[in-house]
Amino acid sequence: ALTGSWVLAPEAAALKVGPAAGNGDWWSNSEDDVTTRSCLFDDHYVFNADGSFQNVQGDQTWLEPWQGSDPEACGAPVAPHDGSNPATWEYDAASGEVTLTGLGAYLGLPKAVNAGELSSDNPPPVPESVTYTATLEGDMMTLVIECGTGVFWTYKLVPAQTAMVSTPFGNDDFRTLVEMMPRDSGPWDWSGYDSISFSYNNTVAQSIENRVHV
C-alpha cells in the first residue's frame, strides 16, 4: 500500500510537533504555510515497487537555518538531503514501521531523525537510516517519528495523484481539487477555479521531475 509517490497533505497541521504522537502543541503548519512553503508541499516521497526510495524535490525545497538559510525560505536542496544518494525503503506491517536506508533519505522534514533534531549547534550526525511509524487510513498516511526523547513529529501524507491545494487567484484563495496523473501515463485532468472548470491534456511524455507545479 505504500508503493507510489506521496506528498504532504496540503492542509493545516500536515506537519506538527509536540510532546506526544499526533500532538501539535509546540508547532504546526497553518493553511497559509501551504502557499508560503509550496516548495515543500510539492516535494515527492517515492516508494518504488523494487524497494528503492527517492526524494524528488525539483529545483527548490524549504530550507532552515541549520541548512544555511536564515531566515527560512525556499531554496536549492542541500546535500545530503537532496535525493542524490541511493536509498531503499522497508515496511514492517506487524509493527507499522517504515525504515529508509540511505544517507539523507527522509520523509516530511529532513531535520527529524531518531537520535534528535539536526541543527547547526551540536547536532546528531546524519544517520544512514531513519525509522518512522506509519498508519494508513484510506488515502492518508500518518507518520510519526520520535526525535531523541519526548519530541514527536507527526506528518500527514497523501498520494501525489490526488491532492487538495490552495491556489491564489486574483485577490481570493480558492480550494481547488486537482486530480494529478503522471504525464507519461495519460492526460492531466484539472478541475478549475471556483465555478470555472477546465482540463489540460499533454501528450508529451515527461518524468516526475518535470511535473507541473501549482
What are these regions (language model features)?
Residues 1-25, 29, 94-101, 145-147, ...:
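Beta-rich carbohydrate-recognition modules and glycan-binding surfaces
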Residues 12-17, 32-139:
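Contiguous, well-ordered beta-strand patches that form the walls/edges
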Residues 128-160:
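C-terminal or internal capping secondary-structure element at the end of a domain, subdomain, or sheet
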